Amino acid sequence: FYHISTDEVYGALELTRPEGDAAGGESGGGPFGEEFFTEETKYAPHSPYSASKASSDHFVRAYHDTYGMPTLVTNCSNNYGPYQFPEKLIPLFINNIRHRRPLPVYGRGQNVRDWLYVEDHARAIDVIFHRGKVADTYNIGGFNEWKNIDLIRVIVRTVDRLLGNPEGASEKLITYVTDRAGHDMRYAIDSRKLKRELGWQPSLQFEEGIEKTVRWYLENQSWMDDITSGEYQQY
């Protein structure tokens, strides 16, 4: 039994490098702190959502311990890529830019997330399912941290360029809104165990992945429109 979970079960990490690591790029990609979530990090969920995910992890392990069911648990960072439901940040903002709608940013956009291209996540699932150690846990991350506001600006620049808009034309759509309750400051996964034991590592640089993602949504606008209009529910 393969159980896919989230890094949110671990709680939150401190933002000890507010500007990130210069080696990671001008505004993203490098670590924003010294600590990372490992497979040994204690669970400390801060929201009902993450608490429910943590409980599901424990249920899976309990079934292995009690009944001997072969299990695997993975905890991954934020995914992005094609076919993501448009309530999620990246497809939502691509669609909002296309329709000239506001781009809502929680707080001041300083929260940090690690981003993983969905095809890299799928490759990790495949290798863990076939070669992972039964009853073990593996973290899957992109080693690719971005502040929300910096990520949004990358999306804005990419969409504007591909649509032929003047540079920075959609920056004015950024709208700061009240921060979300229980909004953890930083998530960052250490997936070196997965690389060391099973040889997996991300294949795409973020710049390539976000370019592919934006292009996909712009080239598949009918799919997005079908979802956002609710027409898909009539199937």
Describe each region flagged by the PLM.
Residues 91, 97-235:
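C-terminal substrate-binding subdomain of Rossmann-fold SDR/epimerase-dehydratase oxidoreductases
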Residues 9-11, 44-48, 72-89, 111-112, ...:
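Flexible, glycine-rich beta-alpha linker
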Residues 1, 29-30, 69-70, 102, ...:
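Active-site loop of short-chain dehydrogenase/reductase
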Residues 15-19, 30-37, 64, 86-94, ...:
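Short, glycine/charged-enriched secondary-structure capping and boundary segments
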Residues 1-47:
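Conserved Rossmann-fold NAD(P)-dependent oxidoreductase catalytic core, especially the SDR/UDP-sugar
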Residues 17, 32, 36-37, 80, ...:
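Short clusters of hydrophobic/aromatic residues that line enzyme substrate/ligand-binding pockets
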Residues 52-55:
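Active-site helix of classical SDR
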Residues 5-6, 57-82, 166-167:
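Conserved beta-loop-beta element that borders a ligand/cofactor-binding pocket
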